[in-house]
Amino acid sequence: MTTKIKTQWTCTECGTHSPKWLGQCSGCLQWNTLVEERTAPKLNTSSYSSSSSIPIPLNNVEFQEEIRIHTQAQGWNRLLGGGTVRGSLALLGGEPGIGKSTLLLQISSQFAAAGHKVLYVCGEESVSQTSLRAQRLQISSNNIFLFPETNLEDIKQQIDNIAPDILVIDSIQIIFSPSLSSAPGSVAQVRETTAELMHIAKQKQITTFIIGHVTKSGEIAGPRILEHLVDTVLYFEGNAHANYRMIRSVKNRFGPTNELLILSMHTDGLREVENPSGLFLQEKIVETTGSTIIPIVEGSETLLIEVQALVSSSPFSNPVRKTSGFDPNRFSLLLAVLEKRANVKLYTSDVFLSIAGGLKITQPSADLGAVLSVVSSLYNRYLPKNYTYTGEIGLGGEIRHVSHMEHRIKESIIMGFKGIVMPFGQIKGLPKEFLDQIDIIGVKTIKDAVRLLQ
């Protein structure tokens, strides 16, 4: 009896299935994202399936620490939680041209220099193109094997032949399995090829890196299950026209998340930035209104970032509120609190807020700096010079506690700032050494903070 082929419609954004075409996906509510897929019913293997594993009491499980591969790139080791775990699968996403292939080729050279075999599957480029990039990056190694292939079965054959320690897939959207009838890059292909690569990585203990393209919204293209399958998800951030890039770990089964690695772009590749705060503050104008410096904590890194605001009279009945690098919904909430609790009128003004350097901030500790930048620009008055600002703002206008306060103060001292404005309630528990090295101003409410304007 021939196997009956079924047709279903799958969302390219979230992977939701539907028996018929819909204009709007019922899962993620996106429009025109459903594509047709043909699937054969799965075989019923329950009659002959077996398992060699049995349930084990938790107290009887023998602990085995993960084997990690270290490179000379200390920032990369820190990003992955202390080195790359053998047999792990990591997904690196980013916009086209931002430097994903360049980075992984450099990391491959680090692994190769340590004596590890690397199989680099360059499906999007020819061997000569990848070789030219390697020459530009001054990379030369007999331990890196280039393989321009997109067929998963051929890739598996070369894995058996070469037995690599490291596998790089560039990119997952172009790899296809001949057992599926759908086109490369489709939801089914991305899901199944990633699942197969995960199985190979775990079975053969091959550390695998796969490159994924991102959608217009900045998320990795393909079904959401792609991020659930892998062990680590890294996002390449930053402006493709700027001379630095940022890599953020948003998922890591073997280490902390939200680690941030900042790299500078040079003719011979990407290099780690030793002093990120100095990089973001090097172009700051000393005497200007509407500007504050905030300390933020990204993983184990503490950075000082400039927040810039511009407030101008609006010629329209509906004023404009725009942000860059700051959550627009959070910003609207802060402006409402500012008007209600501090009596700062903004309903006739256009308000713009930008995080200098292209960094994206999601932590609430940036609230105080953002609000004071707006008030400073509105009144065209200066804030205290050489101070940093940190604190979360509640709906009642209170300045709430933030985490890692000692790290924020320490970074402010290192960068030469003479004072910090912070929640009043956190001053009491600070070490005495901080009180001797930096001026600390505590504020209880947003109204207290506004009074700091000269």
Swiss-Prot record:
InterPro entries: AAA+_ATPase, DNA_repair_RadA, P-loop_NTPase, RecA_ATP-bd, Ribosomal_Su5_D2-typ_SF, Ribsml_uS5_D2-typ_fold_subgr, Rubredoxin_2. Signal peptide: none annotated. Transmembrane segments: none annotated. One of its GO terms (molecular function) is ATP-dependent DNA damage sensor activity. Pfam families: AAA_25, Zn_ribbon_LapB. Its EC number is 3.6.4.-. A zinc finger (C4-type) spans 11-28. GO terms for biological process: recombinational repair. A motif (RadA KNRFG motif) lies at residues 251-255. Keywords: ATP-binding, DNA damage, DNA repair, DNA-binding, Hydrolase, Metal-binding, Nucleotide-binding, Stress response, Zinc, Zinc-finger. Disulfide bonds: none annotated. Residues 350-454 are annotated as: Lon-protease-like. ATP binds at G94, E95, P96, G97, I98, G99, K100, S101. Has a putative N-terminal zinc-finger, a middle region with homology to RecA with ATPase motifs including the RadA KNRFG motif, while the C-terminus is homologous to Lon protease. NCBIfam families: sms. Belongs to the RecA family. RadA subfamily. DNA-dependent ATPase involved in processing of recombination intermediates, plays a role in repairing DNA breaks. Stimulates the branch migration of RecA-mediated strand transfer reactions, allowing the 3' invading strand to extend heteroduplex DNA faster. Binds ssDNA in the presence of ADP but not other nucleotides, has ATPase activity that is stimulated by ssDNA and various branched DNA structures, but inhibited by SSB. Does not have RecA's homology-searching function. PANTHER family: DNA REPAIR PROTEIN RADA (PTHR32472), DNA REPAIR PROTEIN RADA-LIKE PROTEIN (PTHR32472:SF10). This is DNA repair protein RadA. It comes from Chlamydia trachomatis serovar D (strain ATCC VR-885 / DSM 19411 / UW-3/Cx).
